[in-house]
UniProtKB/Swiss-Prot annotation:
One of its GO terms (cellular component) is viral capsid. Highly phosphorylated. This is Minor capsid protein L2. GO terms for biological process: microtubule-dependent intracellular transport of viral material towards nucleus; symbiont entry into host cell; viral penetration into host nucleus. InterPro entries: Late_L2. Its main location: virion. The gene is L2. Keywords: Capsid protein, Cytoplasmic inwards viral transport, Disulfide bond, DNA-binding, Host endosome, Host Golgi apparatus, Host nucleus, Host-virus interaction, Late protein, Microtubular inwards viral transport, Phosphoprotein, Viral penetration into host nucleus, Virion, Virus entry into host cell. It holds the Pfam family Late_protein_L2. Disulfide bonds join C21-C27. It comes from the Viruses. A motif (Nuclear localization signal) lies at residues 1-12, 445-453. It is found in: Virion; Host nucleus; Host early endosome; Host Golgi apparatus.
């Protein structure tokens, strides 16, 4: 096995050591010689430079210039450089003749600047004359404008883009803005009413929220998952598990024994109940319903194995106690509120509105109960205030017929031009009670408005 070697820390450089130890005088000799260039290599270079000079050759400079003349290719001659002196303008030299004066004037006469005319001389000694004047008229300017006609015109343009909608112009003087209304009371009758306002103040610190906090929606609390495969299921039959669970694990503790909290125990070798062997914790109880019963559950943890470091390893056990079963819901027999005799299944109104749920009975209808007839009844009645008209029926079923008031339609005049009466025909109610007829399902099931439909009788059946 290769031993692990510690990482080697980098030593400080000579420059860093020289900066820290030079002031205290504790620098090693090799560090001082290297920084101050006192090594043997530095001394040999210093002594050799006293006898040799390579300054013009550019050796060791690193510039690559090749000295003053530069590099020359092998087998060729260097080019000749001719220095050209720049041309300068000639200086004019005036010759001095024998007859010229030897004194040179510094200022020529042409360079004298004339300052202009001379100062005039004033004559007389009388002095100046002072003239004073006095006026009694005040210096007031007449600013009254001339008589003229002035026309003043103004134009008011309302732009809806620059009008604040919340602002309402009240018919009174004052200042109106989007947030503040400063007004003064005026006399007269207006279309508004002044209502005294009251301040609804709440005593508080001033940091209360200005809006209500919405109550979050109903959140379903997840039920404890006590029936997983990781938990060992143990059924307890001792009732002491409900109020005194500690008596099943260890000896009683007269000082404290919580019934709705988690309990912790020290590992012991012997337990009063063998199902609670090596239990070190019992969690708080939970009531659940499973398979038609109320169940009292606690989750426990065992300490079967303990390591040298003190870590406890064990299974998790679900202890449950069935309190009582949930009885099934009792079935109650329902009784009808109305008797079976009050039935209107055989009553129909062919002219009534089909949308009506239950048509009423007419006072002029003639009802024939089926209990007094040996055959199926079929009764036809018409509501009218005039004569009776009897319509014969077929003798297929020998249906008895009772005459009653019939319908007499009003007739128009025989003279020309014919003017119909208003209304020409009135709406009549016809009630048919019995079971020996059939209504056409097209008109019976369709929800339509009130409408007159033709009808006729054939062999005792009514078809509409």
């Amino acid at each position: 096995m290769v031993a692990h070697r510690a990482t080697r820390r980098k030593r400080a450089s000579a420059t860093q050591l020289y900066k820290t130890c030079k002031l205290s005088g504790t620098c090693p000799e090799d560090v001082v010689n290297k920084i101050e260039q006192k090594t043997w290599a530095d001394k040999i270079l210093q002594w050799g430079s006293l006898f040799t000079y390579f300054g013009g050759l550019g050796i060791g400079t690193g510039t690559g210039s090749g000295g003053r003349a530069g590099y020359v290719p092998l087998g060729s001659r260097p080019s000749t450089i001719v220095d050209v002196t720049p041309a300068r303008p000639p200086i004019v030299v005036e010759s001095v003749g024998p007859t010229d004066p030897s004194i040179v004037t510094l200022v020529e006469e042409s360079s004298v600047i004339e300052s202009g005319a001379g100062i005039p001389n004033f004559t007389g000694s009388g002095g100046f004359e002072i003239t004073s004047s006095s006026t009694t008229t005040p210096a007031v300017l007449d600013i009254t404008p001339t008589s003229s006609t002035v026309h003043v015109s103004s134009t008011h343009i309302t732009n809806p883009l620059f009008i604040d909608p919340p602002v309402i112009e009240a018919p009174q003087t004052g200042e109106v803005s989007g947030n503040i209304l400063i007004s003064t009371p005026t006399s007269g009758i207006h279309s508004y009413e002044e209502i005294p306002m009251q301040t609804f103040a709440v005593h508080g610190s001033g940091t209360e929220p200005i809006s209500s906090t919405p109550i979050p929606g109903f959140r379903r609390i997840a039920a404890p998952r006590l029936y997983r495969k990781a938990f060992q299921q143990v059924k307890v039959t001792d009732p002491a598990f409900l109020d005194r669970p500690a008596t099943l694990v260890s000896a009683d503790n007269p000082l404290f024994e919580g019934t709705d909290t988690s309990l912790a125990f020290s590992p012991s070798g012997v337990a009063p109940d063998p199902d609670f062997m090596n239990i070190v914790a019992l969690h708080r109880p939970a009531f659940t319903t499973r398979r038609g019963g109320v169940r009292f559950s606690r989750l426990g943890r065992k300490a079967t194995i303990q390591t040298r470091r003190g870590t406890q390893i064990g299974a998790r056990v679900h202890y449950y106690y069935d309190i009582s079963p949930i009885a099934q819901a009792e079935e109650i027999e329902m009784q009808p509120l109305l008797s079976a005799n009050n039935s209107f299944d055989g009553l129909y109104d062919i002219y009534a509105n089909i949308d009506d749920e239950a048509p009423g009975l007419s006072s002029q209808s003639v009802a024939t109960p089926s209990a007094h007839l040996p055959i199926k009844p079929s009764t036809l009645s018409f509501a009218s205030n005039t004569t009776n008209v009897t319509a014969p029926l077929g003798n297929v079923w020998e249906t008895p017929f009772y005459s009653g008031p019939d319908i007499v339609l009003p007739t128009g005049p025989s003279t020309w031009p014919f003017v119909p009466q208003s209304p020409y025909d009135v709406t009549h109610d016809v009630y048919i009670q019995g079971s020996s007829f059939a209504l056409w399902p097209v008109y019976f099931f369709r929800r339509r408005r009130r409408k007159r439909i033709p009808y006729f009788f054939a062999d005792g059946d009514v078809a509409a």
